[in-house]
């Protein structure tokens, strides 16, 4: 479960971070 959660976070975080930095 932890591995899947980290995989999802790895896929979701970059767009969110780039959006916040705009």
From Swiss-Prot:
Output the GO biological process annotations, alphabetical, semicolon-separated.
Answer: defense response
Disulfide-bonded cysteine pairs: these are none
GO terms for MF: protein kinase inhibitor activity
Cellular component aspect of the GO annotation: extracellular region
> One matching Pfam family, short form?
Melittin
As stated in the Swiss-Prot or TrEMBL entry, residues carrying the post-translational modification Glutamine amide are 22
Ordered alphabetically, the record's keywords are: Amidation, Amphibian defense peptide, Secreted
Expression by tissue, per the entry, reads: Expressed by the skin glands.
Task: List localization entries.
Answer: Secreted
Q: Which InterPro entries match?
A: Melittin/Api_allergen (IPR002116)
Query: What is the protein name given in its UniProt record?
Result: Melittin-related peptide FQ-22-1
Q: Which organism is it from?
A: Rana arvalis (Moor frog)
């Amino acid at each position: 479960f932890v591995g899947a959660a980290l995989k999802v976070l790895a896929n979701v975080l970059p767009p969110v971070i780039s959006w916040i930095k705009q």
